[in-house]
């Protein structure tokens, strides 16, 4: 069909050294190791390491053949992301350079390659040192960049005349009719009798709408209009995706077929302060996401990136995420499209604005981000301002102009921490921390306004902190979300942040982690995570109930008489063992505006004495009721001694490409199967079969849990991960299959 896009991730050679002649064809490769992409230039423990250790220059080399049938075509090498400066060579010749680690780039390598059995060579020098001239660096940055070719690489083979880009935009959605514009950009030689055929295809493969347009002489940009009756729309609660096929045809031959998935929807912020999708108001409830994973930074395969989107949507109950503070993986956004998670995407940066060269790179980053992602229905706003930077009128005026020129369908935002900052963007997006410890945020000072950060550094909380802190942390998140729901002219609010993340020595708790997440760095929930999950609609996402406590004798006075229960049910019943204690309605006194306020039981009124429950080996159960019927339950039991290790993997099968991996969560439980929240015990691992361990060995659990990752080799087979600890009698294991990728 005129277009082949080949995965280029396997069989790379890597060396963590800066070697002068490593781009040359006949360079000695005996000291290189074989790796697959995505790849981190160095792995680390999940905390206590030096950022300087990943700041070095490394080389990647790959030998490859190009089939004879591709002679006469254009060949491009496409990188999704390389931290931070990439210099690319093919067969010893310099091809090009890219600066910036969060946006894609590609080079035309047609003139450098040979065909048939010839072993071509691509060599990439990756400079992951600090670059003060490239965003986000130049001053302190509250996150780590890491290093390597940490995203996918593709080899694209196209006809000489091909489709360079397609821009799909819903201009109007009203009265069950969608008016759509499709702009197709053509590159290469001029053709005769050319046509563009665009088809919008539903999930059943039925063409719902199509249009054919003749290409005029010298025309490089073709704009087509489509009207669709009764389209299935994209919405967070029903994210329908269509397949779009754009064919370039000449002399009855298909020269190119550019395909992608997208949704039919409109987004806008109105002067009443509300956010609207498809003409209906929607309160935005979200968190911020860093792409940092333990051990490898951002260098995780598509499977793990997609899993993060699932966690945000289904385990945290969100309808929106902000990609702080840079564009994130395409696979993450693809999954957000599929599951209906709205995204506020922003350019790389953190507080600092550099010189004119620095600004020019930021402008290029913005262009690359928008051109890459403007067909994603999940994205509802572009972040065109450096996070928390001071005003720069001329710079930000141009950034807004760039965004509006490249995409007329979305508003711009720019995240700041000063209320009197100049508003050049369409929406005033503000990080509001001042009154967080009172459970409050400020009222909007602009018509179009949303809060993009709250909490975070104001009340950092570790998963293994004392019970009182975990409860207070969760309650503050609940109070602030309640406040934003009670402000009708506030579009929404996103807390800081979803997951704990690695940071530089200038920030965090001194161990290279910012404990600002509602989940830990392994994506395991703290109490606050359960609050967010409880806000999801029970009829769409399932009923939920969680007792935010531990069944231990000691208890701090601050929350001593309250048993906090998060639930999206109408009522909650409390039981001691099987004995009914009380049925409670949600607390709409302290939380009048939340969709699903927490439930709070007075333990004295309920006759609950923690010590007596503990001594009598009793249990506490919360049962969630809808329409008077049980739909969910959660039980707390007194904690015993470490009894067993439980291994749980996200995926039972991964691909044998040498990079695919899955998270394995390790939990220590007592005889009742309860996770022991203060059992911070060491666990050792052994791995057998076609797999490798990513993570610490031994790993010290935190709050009774932790995680490692199991990565495939290039051979299909079975992986057995074994775990043991001298605190428990028996070894535990989990099995993961690896499947051939076919080459």
Swiss-Prot record:
GO BP term, pick one: carbohydrate metabolic process
The record's EC number reads 3.2.1.23
Is Hydrolase among this UniProt entry's keywords?
A: yes
Q: Which UniProt keywords apply?
A: Glycosidase, Hydrolase
Q: Does the keyword Kinase apply?
A: no
Note the PROSITE patterns from the entry. Answer: GLYCOSYL_HYDROL_F2_1, GLYCOSYL_HYDROL_F2_2
Q: What reaction gets catalysed by this protein? A: Hydrolysis of terminal non-reducing beta-D-galactose residues in beta-D-galactosides
What does UniProt list as catalytic? Answer: 388, 453
According to its UniProt record, what is one Pfam family this protein matches?
Glyco_hydro_2_N
Domain of life assignment: Bacteria
Q: Name one GO molecular function term.
A: beta-galactosidase activity
* Family the UniProt entry places it in: Belongs to the glycosyl hydrolase 2 family.
* Role this protein plays: Beta-galactosidase.
On subunit structure and binding partners, the annotation says: Homodimer.
Q: What is this protein called?
A: Beta-galactosidase
**What organism does the record attribute this protein to?**
Thermoanaerobacter pseudethanolicus (strain ATCC 33223 / 39E)
Instruction: List the gene name.
Output: lacZ
């Amino acid at each position: 069909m005129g277009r082949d896009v080949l995965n280029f991730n396997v069989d790379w050679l890597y060396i963590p050294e800066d070697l002068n002649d490593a781009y040359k064809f006949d360079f000695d490769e005996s000291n290189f190791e074989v790796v697959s992409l995505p790849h981190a230039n160095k792995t680390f423990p999940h905390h206590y390491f030096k950022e300087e250790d990943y700041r070095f220059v490394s080389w990647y080399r790959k030998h490859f053949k190009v089939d004879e049938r591709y002679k006469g075509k254009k060949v491009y090498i496409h990188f999704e992301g390389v931290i931070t400066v990439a210099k690319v060579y093919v067969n010893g010749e310099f091809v090009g350079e890219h600066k910036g680690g969060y946006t894609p780039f590609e080079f035309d390598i047609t003139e450098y390659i040979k065909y048939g059995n010839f072993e071509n060579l691509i060599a990439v020098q990756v400079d992951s040192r600090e670059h003060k001239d490239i965003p986000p660096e130049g001053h302190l940055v509250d996150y780590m960049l890491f290093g390597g070719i940490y995203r996918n690489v593709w080899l694209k083979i196209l006809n000489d005349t091909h489709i360079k880009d397609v821009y799909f935009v819903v201009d109007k959605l009203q009265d069950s009719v969608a008016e759509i514009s499709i702009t197709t950009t053509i590159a290469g030689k001029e053709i005769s009798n050319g046509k563009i055929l665009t088809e919008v295809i539903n999930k059943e493969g039925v063409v719902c709408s199509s249009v054919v347009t003749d290409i005029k002489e010298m025309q490089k940009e073709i704009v087509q209009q489509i009207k669709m009756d009764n389209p299935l729309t994209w919405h967070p609660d029903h994210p329908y995706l269509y397949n779009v096929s754009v064919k370039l045809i000449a002399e009855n031959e298909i020269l190119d077929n550019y395909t992608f998935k997208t949704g039919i929807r409109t987004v806008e912020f109105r002067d009443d302060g509300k956010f609207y999708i498809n003409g209906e108001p929607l309160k935005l409830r979200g968190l911020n996401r860093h792409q940092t994973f333990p051990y490898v930074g951002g260098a995780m395969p598509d499977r793990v990136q997609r899993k993060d989107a699932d966690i945000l949507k289904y385990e945290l109950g969100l309808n929106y995420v902000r990609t702080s503070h840079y564009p994130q993986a395409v696979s993450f956004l693809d999954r957000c499209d599929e599951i209906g998670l709205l995204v506020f995407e922003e350019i790389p940066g953190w507080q600092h604005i550099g010189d004119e060269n620095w600004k020019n790179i930021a402008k290029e980053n913005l262009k690359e981000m928008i051109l890459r992602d403007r067909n994603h229905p999940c994205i509802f706003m572009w972040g065109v301002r450096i996070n928390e930077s001071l005003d720069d009128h001329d710079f930000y005026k141009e950034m807004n102009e760039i965004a509006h020129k490249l995409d007329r369908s979305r508003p711009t935002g720019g995240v700041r921490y000063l209320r009197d900052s100049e508003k050049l963007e369409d929406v005033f997006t503000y990080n509001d921390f001042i009154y967080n410890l009172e459970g409050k945020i400020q009222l909007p000072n602009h018509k179009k306004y949303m809060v993009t950060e709250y909490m975070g550094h104001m009340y950092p909380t570790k998963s293994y902190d004392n019970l009182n802190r975990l409860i207070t942390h969760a309650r503050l998140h609940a109070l602030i979300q309640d406040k934003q729901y009670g402000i009708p002219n506030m579009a929404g609010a996103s807390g800081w942040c979803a997951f704990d993340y690695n940071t530089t020595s200038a920030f965090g708790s001194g161990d290279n982690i910012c404990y600002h997440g509602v989940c830990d760095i392994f994506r395991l929930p703290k109490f606050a995570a359960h609050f967010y999950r409880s806000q999801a609609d029970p009829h769409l996402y399932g009923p939920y109930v969680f007792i935010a406590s531990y069944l231990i004798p000691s208890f701090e006075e601050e929350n001593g008489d309250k048993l906090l229960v998060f639930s999206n049910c109408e009522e909650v019943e409390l039981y001691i063992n099987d004995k009914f204690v009380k049925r409670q309605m949600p607390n709409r006194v302290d939380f009048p505006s939340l969709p699903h306020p927490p439930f709070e039981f007075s333990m004295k009124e309920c006759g609950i004495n923690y010590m007596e429950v503990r001594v009598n080996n009793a249990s506490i159960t919360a049962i969630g009721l809808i329409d008077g019927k049980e739909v969910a339950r959660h039980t707390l039991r007194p904690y015993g001694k470490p009894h067993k290790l439980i291994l749980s993997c996200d995926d039972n099968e991964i691909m044998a490409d040498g990079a695919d991996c899955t998270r394995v969560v390790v939990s220590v439980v007592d005889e009742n199967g309860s996770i022991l929240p203060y059992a911070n015990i060491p666990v050792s691992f052994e791995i057998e079969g076609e797999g490798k361990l990513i993570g610490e060995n031994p790993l010290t659990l935190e709050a009774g849990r932790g995680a490692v990752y199991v990565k495939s080799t290039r051979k299909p087979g079975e992986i057995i991960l074994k775990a043991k600890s001298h605190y428990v009698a028996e070894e535990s294991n989990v099995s993961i299959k690896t499947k051939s990728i076919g080459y």
